[in-house]
UniProtKB/Swiss-Prot annotation:
Superkingdom, taxonomy of origin: Eukaryota
Species this protein is from: Canis lupus familiaris
Name of the protein in question: Retinoid isomerohydrolase
N-acetylserine found at: 2
The encoding gene: RPE65
Gene Ontology biological process terms from the UniProt entry: retinal metabolic process; retinoid metabolic process; visual perception; zeaxanthin biosynthetic process
């Protein structure tokens, strides 16, 4: 996909530095020519505060949520950012310490409370973070920033002001929800979260939020659970970051990375555990893939199995005759990749960064093909009859269907991650192109385009430049799937460069169209969207 480059200067460390919010937008300096049709806002979420006073956050997913916005109008660009006023942030600023436990950082006990006060706080339940640093998405006419708990935060996409916290538990039965909901073209939102099912065992609920109706009531108040997936382990749900959706099916991939709920509930308050302390890997289960009939709201008991991998991001899922095509950004093995994303590791000098990454699960882009009709299938025979794929599915004597993938891209310690597609046109449908952030030993140093049919790749890469997830924006008069541009926030600490810029690439060949430079550093961002004017 690209020549593996070295980063001895360690410029990637700028991604993990605390910054201040802005009181008003900055005007960016544009080089090149921004298409006049590109009007709207790029909204992105990520951590912006990596310590509170003398207390540091330890994990990549701990820093307090910073909401970013690049506005595009008539060829000009402005940049703005504000910290999201979550409970976690407001209380930390008020008490000048970390008050709510984050993903990999324990909250320090309140020095004003004695041991009995802290003990009795255990019986009031676990205090879950609302630190909405992962993504932002629309619901009806509103926009919400989110993490992966039951809390989402309504924000104003124009001013970046925080409006209110919303607890999803008040509307549906979920303990949390992913930061990667699917949004259909009519505005319907689908998401997944674990829940307590029958006999107090764990299950996974698919939640549907309808589009805005004529009564203008908040669509979240009309949320409903439409189907439930079983869990392979009664008390240990798998970590779920995304799922697949087509017009007729829902796909859930259950990985061996598990949350030990007994540890979560018993040791959290008393022993100072954090979220990362409660993860463990099931070394023998492999991966279970589940499907449900979306229209009939029915779980289909096809038992798809394959070897172990970590999964964070689905690229796309679609139907092809009597098969489901599931394209995934995988990490080989059962060990949790997040174990390697502590800030101490990511801030190491380059040789240490590489050394740590060599121990981690290795990335691979894979295509799995799931046969839907297995009623009359022969045991031991490959059920995949589609041309142009090497993926296989074999029915075993225990009625499980063993899947072997087709590899779409693989490079040693070279990940194609944070995938994006022309979602409005191709989400849940056959497609050709995916865009991704290239990770070099976990350091983001290139932008990539992948033809999933031919495996041809294109790359944008510059020295001492660290881009973000690419966001595809379609041309308003597009005739082809890749007619449009790709947007990415690039941190550029190298000599002679501005600290950061918004990069605009031609989506066909990743050639540069324009860039909009700012005079301040921009820390790492995870996910976001383009909101058209």
């Amino acid at each position: 996909m690209s020549i593996q480059v070295e980063h001895p200067a360690g410029g990637y460390k700028k991604l993990f530095e605390t910054v201040e919010e802005l009181s008003s937008p900055l005007t960016a300096h544009v080089t090149g020519r921004i298409p006049l049709w590109l009007t709207g806002s790029l909204l992105r979420c990520g951590p912006g505060l990596f310590e509170v006073g003398s207390e540091p956050f330890y994990h990549l997913f701990d820093g307090q949520a910073l909401l970013h916005k690049f506005d595009f109008k008539e060829g000009h660009v402005t940049y703005h950012r504000r910290f999201i006023r979550t409970d976690a942030y407001v209380r930390a600023m008020t008490e000048k310490r970390i008050v709510i436990t984050e993903f990999g950082t324990c909250a320090f006990p309140d020095p004003c409370k004695n041991i009995f006060s802290r003990f009795f706080s255990y019986f009031r339940g676990v205090e879950v973070t609302d630190n909405a640093l992962v993504n932002v998405y629309p619901v009806g006419e509103d926009y919400y920033a989110c993490t992966e708990t039951n809390f989402i935060t309504k924000i104003n996409p124009e001013t970046l002001e925080t409006i209110k916290q919303v607890d999803l538990c008040n509307y549906v039965s979920v303990n949390g929800a992913t930061a990667h909901p699917h949004i259909e073209n009519d505005g319907t939102v689908y998401n997944i979260g674990n829940c307590f099912g029958k006999n107090f065992s764990i299950a996974y609920n698919i939640v549907k939020i309808p589009p805005l109706q004529a009564d203008k009531e908040d669509p979240i108040s009309k949320s409903e659970v439409v189907v439930q997936f079983p869990c392979s382990d009664r008390f240990k749900p798998s970590y779920v970051h995304s799922f697949g959706l087509t017009p007729n099916y829902i796909v859930f991939v259950e990985t061996p990375v598990k949350i030990n709920l007994l540890k979560f509930l018993s040791s959290w308050s008393l022993w100072g555990a954090n979220y990362m302390d409660c993860f463990e890997s099931n070394e023998t289960m492999g991966v279970w893939l589940h499907i449900a009939d979306k229209k009939r709201k029915k779980y289909l008991n096809n038992k798809y199995r394959t070897s172990s991998f970590n999964l964070f991001h689905h690229i796309n899922t679609y139907e092809d005759n009597e098969f489901l095509i599931v394209d995934l950004c995988c990490w080989k093995g059962f060990e949790f990749v997040y174990n390697y994303l502590y800030l101490a590791n990511l801030r190491e000098n380059w040789e240490e960064v590489k050394k740590n990454a060599r121990k981690a699960p290795q990335p691979e882009v894979r295509r799995y093909v799931l046969p839907l009709n297995i009623d009359k299938a022969d045991t031991g025979k490959n059920l995949v009859t589609l041309p142009n794929t090497t993926a296989t599915a074999t029915l075993r004597s225990d009625e499980t269907i063993w899947l072997e993938p087709e590899v779409l891209f693989s490079g040693p310690r070279q990940a194609f991650e944070f995938p994006q597609i022309n979602y409005q046109k191709s989400g849940g449908k056959p497609y050709t192109y995916a865009y991704g952030l290239g990770l070099n030993h976990f350091v983001p140093d290139r932008l990539c385009k992948l033809n999933v049919k031919t495996k041809e790749t294109w790359v944008w890469q510059e020295p001492d430049s660290y881009p973000s997830e690419p966001i595809f924006v379609s041309h308003p008069d597009a005739l082809e799937e890749d007619d449009g541009v790709v947007l990415s926030v690039v941190v550029s600490p190298g000599a002679g460069q501005k600290p950061a810029y918004l990069l605009i690439l031609n989506a066909k060949d990743l050639s540069e169209v324009a860039r909009a430079e700012v005079e301040i550093n921009i820390p790492v961002t995870f996910h976001g969207l383009f909101k058209k004017s």
